[in-house]
């Protein structure tokens, strides 16, 4: 009837709460609330709980809130204020009364918030994509317990920019398998997940996932603005690209963790443990997304705990950028990029960069890796090149088997580069820095630091194939290797080992440490398909330049080749000291001619590709060269020896040591290498300076000692040949063969008792005492070549007018003209009563 009233419904403009008491709670229990596609569903009040309903038979029915392609708004408040619609922002904060306190939102028992798009059809029956909507949560606390939030996109339309938008003023907790998902399965872009909270805790398998599947769509980003973030018990944050069709180029979204203020700010701490992980992955043709962490502290602990960017097919993995003050990885935890593609056109694996909070080029305070399996790694299991690893920190510590590594001994592609820039690098306990390749070239290892300490560890760049070993380059102030520490570049087949270049302040090797660039292959490689034969690889070079001292105790520097040319060794330092079995060697066990067989116009043709001569050794010292119980050799078993040159302005001293360029080959055209020694003094004690040959010609030994050449009878200088022509020995020195032998000064000292007795005897004889007289020199300067007076003298003035006071009075430094004073004796010793008992 016309007289009846009508109910009119208009869009809500705002939700207002004016009562000083907290708003009443809202509970959805086992119900399903759904709005039409594209519309909004809002719950605004006090604490909000979405949970299951338990029936009398004990079964549970989960609660569901559904808004396909629309919006779900959950706003929990605990104080007066106003919420505006549709923005869900708070109203003007008049007199500070707008929502000073927020409430709690709880999702549990399998609850679902879903704003996923629905695939439809147009008038002609063609499929139409459905864009995902937005889940918006505003609260003081959020608990998601065994429940789910999702906003998926299908088809060619884009999802909302933020599929999940959560802002919590205090703490957000996801637990017991809970998940937040946004997935795009067409050409449309997936929505982002944005979570802002002072504390975020994910535990017991909780996850946040964005993904793209079967299309060209770009996955949504995961952006966490947090104070602290903790992942425990297998929890994860993931961005995935799962595009498998050849035309599918869908790219995974990025994972970004930063401070509460957003871009450019740093979280207080990010902690992952118990097999939890951050993952950016590509499982098809699409590219993986980027992983970026900006936090004052990053802690990873546990064997399967990882920050990982991986590519399993031709798609490339995303890069990892970690900006921190302090980073700690332990118990097998890793920061890792990898690719497993067998496609030769697959892109380079992603890079890993750990640096300071200011980004590119800045330095973290500390990066510490400990425990077997812990590490920063870029790896490939296929043909693609491994990515690079860069660490910039004031202090870098690796211990207990931890690694910084690119490539592996299984990959067929080239290894990546390792770059470390630090104030100090401390490596101990079998830790390693590696660039490896099974078939391709190994990458470069470069360290720039004020100090590098290595204790029972290794730095290695090597390949086990026809590839080239990578170079190792150190630019370090102080370098110390001890207890078997190794710096190595090697090849074990036909490739050339890389070079090792060290520009340092001081270098110390001790207790079996080693610097080596070597070819360890022993035989030529035969190709069974065409019968061609490849020659074994050659050793690389070692170049050491030290502004200060170089010392080596019971250690090795080697550029040896088992079946090809040995590499060269060059050492330049202020002083050089070798002791206790130190070996510097550039030996070769190869034949005089290194040959291989190649296929030319269908014919196998043998050709010479090199010689098997030993490498050369050059040592230049700015002061002295001292070798004790050590060896320096460029010997060859079947070819010619290398050259050895020792150049220093002061002294070369060899004690029970060996300098040898001898050869043992049976060919008459093998020759011992030449030896050149050119200091001011040469001192040989039980030493061997030899350039001998068996069938060929002995080498030339040139010793130029501008002041003296001194050797004992046990020392040998020999350039003879057993069957061939002896070499030459040329010794130029104004002074040679002093005394026939060298002997140390006596270490027997006069008896103080005997000297005291003589003093007593002198006193008894006539009362005369030994005296020391200080007399002026009338201001004359010291004569040329004479001794200079001590700048400060003291004496006990006994028996003089100074006795009894100022017992130890310093005499002024001797400078300029002496003052005039009367020369008087100073009694040097007070015998006292000692003489009365003689």
Give, region by region, the residue ranges found by the protein language model.
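Extracellular and secretory-pathway beta-repeat/beta-biased strand scaffolds
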Residues: 1-838
């Amino acid at each position: 009837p016309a007289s009846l009233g009508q109910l009119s419904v208009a869009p809500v403009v705002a939700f207002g709460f004016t009562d000083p008491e907290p708003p009443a709670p809202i509970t959805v229990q086992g119900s399903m609330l759904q709005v039409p596609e594209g519309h909004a569903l809002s719950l605004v009040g006090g604490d909000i709980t979405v949970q299951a309903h338990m029936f009398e038979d004990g079964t549970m029915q989960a609660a569901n809130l559904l808004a396909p392609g629309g919006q779900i708004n959950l706003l929990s408040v605990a104080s007066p204020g106003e919420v505006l619609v549709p923005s869900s922002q708070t109203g003007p904060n008049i007199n500070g009364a707008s929502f000073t306190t927020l409430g709690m939102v709880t999702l549990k028992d399998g609850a679902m918030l879903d704003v996923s798009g629905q695939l439809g059809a147009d008038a002609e029956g063609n499929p139409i994509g459905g864009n995902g909507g937005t889940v918006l949560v505003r609260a003081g606390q959020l608990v998601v317990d065994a429940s789910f939030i999702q906003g998926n996109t299908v088809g060619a339309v884009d999802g909302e920019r933020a599929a999940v938008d959560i802002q919590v003023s205090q703490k957000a907790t996801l637990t017991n398998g809970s998940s937040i998902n946004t997935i795009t399965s067409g050409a449309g872009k997936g929505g982002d997940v944005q979570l802002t909270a002072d504390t975020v805790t994910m535990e017991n398998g909780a996850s946040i996932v964005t993904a793209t599947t079967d299309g060209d769509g770009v996955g949504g980003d995961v952006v966490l603005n947090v104070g602290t973030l903790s992942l425990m018990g297998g929890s994860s944050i993931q961005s995935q690209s799962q595009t498998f069709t050849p035309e599918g180029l869908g790219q995974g979204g990025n994972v970004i963790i930063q401070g509460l203020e957003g871009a450019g700010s740093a979280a207080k701490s990010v902690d992952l443990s118990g097999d939890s992980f951050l993952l950016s992955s590509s499982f098809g043709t699409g590219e993986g997304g980027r992983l970026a962490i900006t936090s004052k502290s990053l802690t990873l602990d546990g064997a399967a705990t990882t920050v990982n960017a991986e590519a399993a097919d031709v798609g490339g993995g995303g890069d990892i950028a970690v900006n921190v003050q302090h980073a700690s990885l332990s118990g097998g935890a890793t920061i890792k990029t990898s690719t497993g593609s067998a496609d030769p056109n697959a892109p380079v694996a992603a890079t890993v960069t750990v640096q300071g909070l200011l980004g590119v080029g800045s330095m973290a305070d500390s990066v510490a890796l400990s425990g077997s399996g812990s590490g920063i790694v870029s790896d490939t299991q296929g043909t693609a090149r491994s990515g690079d690893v860069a660490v910039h920190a004031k202090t870098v510590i690796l211990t207990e088997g931890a690694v910084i590594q690119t490539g592996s001994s299984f990959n067929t592609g080239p290894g990546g580069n390792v770059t470390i820039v630090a104030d100090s690098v401390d490596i101990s306990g079998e830790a390693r820095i590696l660039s490896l390749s099974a078939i391709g070239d190994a990458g470069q290892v470069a360290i720039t630091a004020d100090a590098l300490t290595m204790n029972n560890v290794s730095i290695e760049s090597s390949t086990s194939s026809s590839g080239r070993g990578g170079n190792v380059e150190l630019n370090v102030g102080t370098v110390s290797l001890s207890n078997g520490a190794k710096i190595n570049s090697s090849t074990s087949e036909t490739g050339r080992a890389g070079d090792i270049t060290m520009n340092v302040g001081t270098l110390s090797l001790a207790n079996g440490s080693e610097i080596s660039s070597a070819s360890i292959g022993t035989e030529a490689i035969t190709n069974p398909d065409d019968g061609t034969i490849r020659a074994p690889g050659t050793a690389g070079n070692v170049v050491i330049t030290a502004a200060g001292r170089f010392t080596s105790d019971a250690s090795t520097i080697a550029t040896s080749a088992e079946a090809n040319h040995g590499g060269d060794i060059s050492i330049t330092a202020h002083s050089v000291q070798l002791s206790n079995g130190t070996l510097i060697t550039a030996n070769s066990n190869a034949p005089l001619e290194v040959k291989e067989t190649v296929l030319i116009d269908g014919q196998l043709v043998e050709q010479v590709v090199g010689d098997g001569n030993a490498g050369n050794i050059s040592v230049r010292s700015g002061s002295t060269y001292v070798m004790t119980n050590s060896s320096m050799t460029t010997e060859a078993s079947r070819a010619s020896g290398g050259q050895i040159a020792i150049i220093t302005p002061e002294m070369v001293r060899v004690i029970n040591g060996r300098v040898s360029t001898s050869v043992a080959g049976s060919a008459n055209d093998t020759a011992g290498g030449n030896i050149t020694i050119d200091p001011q003094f040469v001192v040989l004690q039980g030493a061997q300076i030899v350039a001998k040959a068996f069938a060929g010609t002995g080498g030339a030994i040139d010793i130029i000692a501008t002041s003296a050449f001194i050797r004992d009878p046990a020392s040998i200088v020999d350039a003879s040949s057993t069957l061939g022509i002896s070499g030459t020995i040329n010794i130029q020195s104004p002074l040679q063969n002093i005394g026939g032998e060298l002997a140390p000064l006596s270490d027997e000292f006069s008896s103080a008792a005997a000297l005291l007795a003589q003093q007593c005897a002198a006193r008894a004889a006539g009362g005369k005492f030994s005296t020391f007289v200080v007399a002026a020199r009338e201001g004359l300067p010291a004569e040329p070549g004479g001794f200079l007076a001590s700048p400060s003298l003291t004496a006990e003035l006994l028996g003089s007018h100074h006795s009894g006071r100022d017992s130890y009075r310093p005499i002024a430094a001797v400078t300029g003209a002496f003052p005039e004073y009367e020369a008087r004796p100073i009694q040097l010793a007070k015998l006292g009563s000692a003489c009365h008992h003689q």
